[in-house]
Regions:
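Bacterial N-terminal signal peptides that target proteins for export
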Residues: 2-10
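Intrinsic low-complexity, intrinsically disordered segments enriched in polar/basic residues
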Residues: 1-2, 53
């Protein structure tokens, strides 16, 4: 059987490109989840300024959060970000998807101790780890 070096080279290049794209995606996911985590922590603490700063760190994804004028607006923007955070978090170790049954909202956090970003300090422990 003759080896076709062009075919082998093409397969090798495609494999290398796939690995490179996966690494880039993973780095982007980590950056997103890090900034998202800062927003989560700020909202748990009812810190609008910290949430807005985290929104800026999120780039275009965090535009609504960075422009929020109230904690309610920030939490609404964070809810949209949470929808986006669930998928990359599933592929990263140390991230957990949590759910608040009273508000019917999900979020991603790094701790297994519930820290609900949606209900303010009065609802900080409302929720459960889903994944």
């Amino acid at each position: 059987m003759k080896l076709n070096y062009k075919t082998i080279l093409a397969v090798f290049a495609a494999t290398a490109l796939t690995v490179s794209l996966q690494a880039a995606s993973s780095d982007q996911d980590k950056q997103f989840l890090t900034a998202y985590g800062k927003a989560h922590d700020a909202l748990v603490a009812d810190d609008l300024g910290g949430a807005k700063k985290a929104g800026t760190d999120l780039g275009p994804d965090g535009a609504d959060l960075s422009k929020s004028k109230s904690l309610d607006e920030a939490r609404a923007a964070f809810d949209k970000l949470s929808d986006k955070a669930v998928k990359p978090a599933a592929g990263q170790s140390g991230y957990h998807v949590a759910h608040c049954p009273m508000l019917n909202k999900d979020w991603v956090q790094t701790s297994t101790t519930i820290a609900n970003p949606y209900g303010g300090k009065g609802m900080i422990s409302c929720g459960e780890i889903k994944k």
